[in-house]
Amino acid sequence: MPLLDSFTVDHTRMEAPAVRVAKKMNTPHGDEITVFDLRFCVPNQEVMPERGIHTLEHLFAGFMRDHLNGNGVEIIDISPMGCRTGFYMSLIGTPDEQRVADAWKAAMADVLKVKDQNQIPELNVYQCGTYTMHSLEEAQDIARHIIERDVRINSNDELALPKEKLQELHI
């Protein structure tokens, strides 16, 4: 099995909240695709609650588009990580990390403005696979956590696992 890019960085040294360019690629037609690691929690120390991350998934996708789309950038998808420590965001374009961080903070401020659960988009049996598993309160706690701690930038060069370590891990 090939070694995925996300497993070549040292999770013990990641800061959170932080933005990291996880991958860059070009389509056959020359479009630039960038995948960002939006790390909400320090790996192996913190985790987002499942109801909160699910609600945030519904809110974050729209709010990030409001703040980041345009000027050569269009978000393709924002999806939670299985480890519940962050989200991956795939987009067309190559915005710098600070632009992404600023949009992320603005999106979190928008999450705090949501007044009740009925304002969560697609919160129904037809558009959500687990529509009863939501918590606006938990999503807003996560948003407050991001705003209070601010968003930093994680560098791939600083986080790269040395080849010796990868060999030691039998990868």
Curated annotation (Swiss-Prot):
Cofactor descriptive note: Binds 1 Fe cation per subunit.
Keyword entries, A-Z: Autoinducer synthesis, Iron, Lyase, Metal-binding, Quorum sensing
Pfam families, A to Z: LuxS (PF02664)
Single GO molecular function: iron ion binding
Keyword Lyase: yes
Cofactor(s) needed by this chain: Fe cation
Enzyme class: lyase
Residue positions binding Fe cation: H54, H58, C128
Catalyzed reactions: S-(5-deoxy-D-ribos-5-yl)-L-homocysteine = (S)-4,5-dihydroxypentane-2,3-dione + L-homocysteine
Function: Involved in the synthesis of autoinducer 2 (AI-2) which is secreted by bacteria and is used to communicate both the cell density and the metabolic potential of the environment. The regulation of gene expression in response to changes in cell density is called quorum sensing. Catalyzes the transformation of S-ribosylhomocysteine (RHC) to homocysteine (HC) and 4,5-dihydroxy-2,3-pentadione (DPD).
Record text on subunit structure and interactions: Homodimer.
NCBIfam families, per database record: PRK02260.1-2
Family the entry assigns: Belongs to the LuxS family.
Record protein name field: S-ribosylhomocysteine lyase
Species of the source: Klebsiella pneumoniae (strain 342)
Gene name of the record: luxS
